[in-house]
Amino acid sequence: MSKLNDIRFFQVKPAIYYGIGAIEQVGNHDFKQVCIVTDEGMVKFGLLKMLTDVLDKHNIKYHVFSDVEPDPSTEIVEKGLTHILMEKPDALIALGGGSAIDSAKAIIYYCYNFKKMFFEEDYIKKPYFIAMPTGSVGRQNPVLQERTKSRP
């Protein structure tokens, strides 16, 4: 039987940028170094380069973790956590769909708890989280079409 004091809570408050030119807003932050969590699709289609060009323009160092796969496993999250602990970025940017965003949030969660258990308070700071979703409503389109068929 669980006790009330066994309950734990963690909340991530992401900043989600969207719209034409939203990627440029990353340069408006005072980041020294960021870690980008993404997948190979974002690399292949050039979206990662768009982001790294903005970071380069603002002299923000970055490290890319592009091992995210659909429905990421705990092993993927652990690999991402290793990158965070080694690089100690100011921010974590999730670039991609739900898998990249979920992976980044899980990495931050474990980073925060790992830090509390093993490190002094100032060794690693919880990185700021930015989500840059690239998914479209295209996947929802068949559902929307089906819903509108029954309307008069």
Q: Where do the protein language model's features map onto the residues?
A:
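N-terminal amphipathic/basic leader segments beginning at the initiator methionine
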Residues: 1-30
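A glycine/threonine-rich phosphate-anchoring loop and its flanking beta-alpha core
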Residues: 6, 14, 112-152
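Glycine-rich phosphate/diphosphate-binding loop of Rossmann-like nucleotide-binding domains
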Residues: 28, 35-53
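Nucleotide donor/acceptor-binding cores
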Residues: 31-34, 127
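Conserved beta-strand elements of the Class I
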Residues: 35-36, 91-93, 130
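Cofactor-binding loop segments of dinucleotide-utilizing enzymes, especially the Rossmann-like FAD-
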Residues: 38-39, 67, 132-134
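N-terminal small/polar loop signature for handling phosphorylated ligands or for N-terminal nucleophile
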Residues: 46-123
